[in-house]
C-alpha cells in the first residue's frame, strides 16, 4: 500500500453566522474553524416555517405597470377635437365624391 495516499483528516468546527450554532466534524479541510451562512437549526425549510419572498417576477412587474397606466388614463381629462367640423366627420357616399 502507498504511504500518504489519503489526505490528513482533522476536527473542523463549523459555526453558523445567523444563530451561532456550532458543530464539529472530521474533515480534510486545512482550516480549524469555518463560518457558514445558515445551518439546519435556523433554515426555514428544516424548522417548518417557510417565509414568503417579496421578490416579484416579470409578470407581477408587468401587471403593476399596466394597472398604473390604466389608473393614469382614467384620471386624465379628454382632449377636445382640433378644428374638425361636421363636414369632415360626416361619411360621404360614392355619388357625393
UniProtKB/Swiss-Prot annotation:
GO cellular component assignments: ribonucleoprotein complex; ribosome
Keywords of this entry: Ribonucleoprotein, Ribosomal protein, RNA-binding, rRNA-binding
InterPro entries: Ribosomal_bL28/bL31-like_sf, Ribosomal_bL31, Ribosomal_bL31_A, Ribosomal_bL31_sf
Signal peptide location: none
Single GO BP term: translation
Summary of subunit composition and partner proteins: Part of the 50S ribosomal subunit.
Protein's recorded name: Large ribosomal subunit protein bL31
Encoding gene (name): rpmE
